[in-house]
Structure formats: C-alpha cells, structure tokens
From Swiss-Prot:
<feature type="active site" description="Proton acceptor">
    <location>
        <position position="102"/>
    </location>
</feature>
<keyword id="KW-0173">Coenzyme A biosynthesis</keyword>
<comment type="subunit">
    <text>Homodimer.</text>
</comment>
<feature type="binding site">
    <location>
        <position position="124"/>
    </location>
    <ligand>
        <name>ATP</name>
    </ligand>
</feature>
<comment type="pathway">
    <text>Cofactor biosynthesis; coenzyme A biosynthesis; CoA from (R)-pantothenate: step 1/5.</text>
</comment>
<feature type="binding site">
    <location>
        <begin position="5"/>
        <end position="12"/>
    </location>
    <ligand>
        <name>ATP</name>
    </ligand>
</feature>
<keyword id="KW-0630">Potassium</keyword>
<protein>
    <recommendedName>
        <fullName>Type III pantothenate kinase</fullName>
        <ecNumber>2.7.1.33</ecNumber>
    </recommendedName>
</protein>
<keyword id="KW-0067">ATP-binding</keyword>
<dbReference type="InterPro" id="IPR043129">
    <property type="entry name" value="ATPase_NBD"/>
</dbReference>
<comment type="similarity">
    <text>Belongs to the type III pantothenate kinase family.</text>
</comment>
<dbReference type="Pfam" id="PF03309">
    <property type="entry name" value="Pan_kinase"/>
</dbReference>
<feature type="binding site">
    <location>
        <position position="94"/>
    </location>
    <ligand>
        <name>substrate</name>
    </ligand>
</feature>
<keyword id="KW-0808">Transferase</keyword>
<dbReference type="InterPro" id="IPR004619">
    <property type="entry name" value="Type_III_PanK"/>
</dbReference>
<dbReference type="GO" id="GO:0005737">
    <property type="term" value="C:cytoplasm"/>
</dbReference>
<feature type="binding site">
    <location>
        <begin position="100"/>
        <end position="103"/>
    </location>
    <ligand>
        <name>substrate</name>
    </ligand>
</feature>
Length: 242
C-alpha cells in the first residue's frame, strides 16, 4: 500500500507491506506543487508495486485534480479520504465540511471506544480535540509556536527574528527569551487548563512539535507519531469491509 498525506506545506508518504509494516517513508516540502513532486517520486513508488493508494489531502480541489492526473499514470487504484461526521468508528459533533481531513484522521487513528481522550496535534496549527468513547465532542485550534513567533516578528518593529528556542516556560530576562517562553507558555497553559477541565481524559500528543510542548504539560502525556498513518489504514480497511 502507498499512503499519502498532502498537508499545507509538506507531502508525506508511507509504503507498507502486506502486514502493514512500513518499508519506506519520507516527508518533503511541496511548495504548493505536490503534483510535480509526486512525478519525481513515481519511480520510487513503482519499485514497491503498491496495489492501492490512499490519500489524505487538505489542499484545494484544483491541486487535488493535478495530483489525481499524476497518480493516474501509475495505473494503480487510488482514493481520497472524505471526512464523515457519522463515520461508524467515530461520531463527531463537528460540521464535517469544516473538519480538516488530517485532523479527523489523527483522531480516527487514536480513537478507542473504551476511553476518553484529549488528542493534541502539534503541526502548522495546534489542535485540541476531546473524544468521549468514540464520540468527538469538539475542540480548539491555536496558531503553532512558530506561527505565533512569525506573527509577532512581522507585526512588531522592535522585535527582530532570532534563533531562540522554545525550551522553557519560566520568565525570560531578554526579549528573545521572553518572546519564546511567552509563546510556549500560552500553549502549555491552554493545554493544562483544558486537561484540568477534563481530568478523566487521556492526553495524547502528535506532530512535529509534540515533544517540545509535552515536557511542560502538567499531566502524563502519551506521544504518538503514527496517528495519521493509522487513521488512513483504519479508514480504508473499514471502507473495504463495508
């Protein structure tokens, strides 16, 4: 199988064997030209001879059409994920037309009917979703730590871009530290507040910035890096069965 995740800035792919083990995986910047990037990867895909391509995409219809045209040249069946608020594995209170495909698949990859879960995605945006025994209750969306920093730098003449790090939530004694620690604290504080309101929910974090943020959260955190892939596999496995 070939699994594709077409995000806002990056294309990720996983090639898995017959028992679901990953045999090849990579992530690349697509620069809003995912079809062209895929064209350069087709030789690599063909070497593994996948029998199906499952696709998660947050891109618009125009780019998805170009991706479809490129994939059609492989002569391999492919299908895009369609968000469904009434999906059997997880119901959602959310308007499915407004629920991002990648966010939904991350939840689908984590959902456990026996648990209450607080799933936090740490990518281009910070998403916090509450799932009660496979029912999505809704959630919150924040700018990521890097989007917040970029916004502050672009809107404030007195603060210039620097190479500071998001490594502490204690007060800063330089502007550089104060900016980075303030941004990190705003996100950590929100997560701590939400987890305090929902003490019986397991906290799960995923995404590129998860490890940075998790160490400052005041609850045990389970880190997962396989949720979107797991969600893709669950989605198409259930589709085949039904």
């Amino acid at each position: 199988m070939l699994w594709l995740d077409l995000g806002n800035t990056r294309l990720k792919y996983w090639l898995t064997d017959d028992i679901g083990q990953i045999v090849s995986h990579d992530a690349k910047q697509h620069l809003q030209a995912p079809a062209e990037l895929l064209m350069g990867l087709t030789d690599r895909f063909e070497r593994y001879a996948p029998d199906f391509i499952g696709i998660s995409s947050v891109l618009g219809d125009d780019l998805n059409i170009k991706v479809s045209e490129t994939l059609s040249r492989l002569n391999i069946p492919f299908e895009f994920v369609h968000v469904d608020a009434n999906y059997p594995l997880m119901k959602s209170a959310y308007n499915d037309e407004q629920l991002g495909c990648d966010r939904w698949l991350q939840m689908l990859g984590a959902v456990d009917k026996t648990k209450r879960q607080c799933l936090i995605g740490c990518g281009t945006a910070i998403t916090i979703d509450l799932i009660d025994h496979a029912t999505h209750l809704g959630g919150y969306i924040f700018p990521s730590i890097y989007l917040q920093r970029e916004s502050l730098f672009s809107g404030t003449k007195q603060i210039t871009i620097s190479n500071g790090t998001f490594d502490s939530v204690s007060q800063g004694i330089t502007t550089q530290d104060a900016v980075h620690r303030g941004i990190l604290l705003s996100i950590v504080g929100a997560i701590n507040e939400i987890s305090t309101r929902h003490p019986n929910f397991e906290v799960i974090m995923t995404g590129g910035d998860a490890a940075i943020i998790a160490q400052h959260v005041n609850r045990p955190v389970r880190l997962r890096d396989d949720l979107l892939l797991n969600g893709l596999a669950r989605y198409f496995d259930h589709s085949k069965q039904s």
